[in-house]
């Protein structure tokens, strides 16, 4: 297994987020052409094969890909510069998303894809550990205050990951998912990131939102060939966000504790 260097970026020596946003590699889907090479091309084609499959359960992702709305960040490794690169790209994405007009056709999702050199693991749990390590490192370099109204502890139903002042929902997808195929976007580990508010608009705790969620969860069960995870729920209604970031293969109760800790806690 080539996962990530334990403690490599922990403690002192955190990289600083580039305030100017220079060297950020936020790539628009519409910019991707034949010049995309190597593992970037492999990863993009894997993702395309999923999101053009009519059976893929997330209709919002399929719509975004069909309309070339998806944004990408490709991460080469797990060093300081790689975290800096990802942080700058994520900051640009947050800035792009701040003035969202509420329309589905301007709801740009972000897919962060990691090379096999950054992480190659043997299990879903190991990929999740890497994903949480990345989120912890992003939190460490984020100079923006945590948004008011969002709890700082992931064991609260009112917590979500935040970056550059924006609450986010993050989906960890990995090649180790053999049962939950809807969380497998191909040969590379990926974080699928959206602003938290979009789920409240399209699939929140309203009659129409509950209908959307029910439809998607039915599609998940058919696509995966197994009932959807017990941990799936709506923000602020008792379900824990962090458990939905990384789903386990089995349908079971979970008693594990989120590895994310708020800076200074």
From Swiss-Prot:
Cofactor(s) essential for the protein: heme
Organism the protein comes from: Streptomyces lavendulae
Transmembrane segments annotated in the record for this chain: none
Highest taxon of source: Bacteria
Any GO MF annotation of the entry: metal ion binding
Swiss-Prot/TrEMBL keywords: Antibiotic biosynthesis, Heme, Iron, Metal-binding
Protein name: Putative N(omega)-hydroxy-L-arginine synthase DcsA
Gene this protein is translated from: dcsA
Example GO BP: antibiotic biosynthetic process
Sequence similarity: Belongs to the DcsA family.
Disruption phenotype: Cells lacking this gene do not produce cycloserine (DCS).
Pfam families reported for this sequence: YqcI_YcgG (PF08892)
Known function: Involved in the biosynthesis of the antibiotic D-cycloserine (DCS), a cyclic structural analog of D-alanine, used as an antitubercular agent. Could catalyze the production of N(omega)-hydroxy-L-arginine (NHA) from L-arginine.
């Amino acid at each position: 297994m080539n996962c990530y260097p334990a403690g490599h970026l922990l403690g002192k020596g955190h990289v600083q987020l580039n305030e100017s946003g220079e060297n950020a590699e936020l790539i628009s889907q519409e910019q991707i052409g034949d010049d995309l090479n190597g593992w970037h091309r492999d990863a993009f084609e894997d993702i395309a094969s999923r999101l053009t499959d009519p059976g893929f359960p997330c209709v919002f992702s399929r719509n975004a890909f069909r309309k070339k709305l998806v944004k990408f960040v490709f991460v080469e490794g797990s060093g300081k510069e790689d975290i800096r690169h990802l942080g700058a790209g994520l900051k640009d994405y947050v800035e792009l998303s701040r003035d969202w007009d509420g329309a589905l056709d301007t709801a740009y999702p972000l897919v962060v894809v990691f090379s096999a050199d950054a992480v190659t693991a043997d299990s879903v749990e190991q990929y999740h550990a890497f994903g949480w390590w990345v989120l912890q490192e992003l939190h460490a370099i984020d100079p923006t205050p945590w948004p008011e109204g969002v709890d700082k502890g992931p064991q609260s139903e009112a917590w979500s990951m935040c970056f550059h002042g924006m609450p986010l929902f993050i989906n960890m997808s990995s090649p180790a998912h053999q049962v939950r195929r809807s969380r497998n976007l191909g040969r590379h580990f990926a974080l699928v990131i959206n602003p938290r508010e979009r789920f409240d608009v399209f699939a929140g705790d309203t009659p129409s939102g509950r209908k959307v969620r029910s439809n998607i969860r039915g599609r998940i069960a058919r696509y995966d060939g197994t009932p959807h995870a017990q941990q799936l729920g709506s923000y602020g209604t008792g379900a824990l966000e962090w458990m939905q970031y990384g789903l386990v293969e089995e349908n079971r109760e979970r008693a594990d504790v989120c590895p994310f800790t708020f800076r200074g806690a």
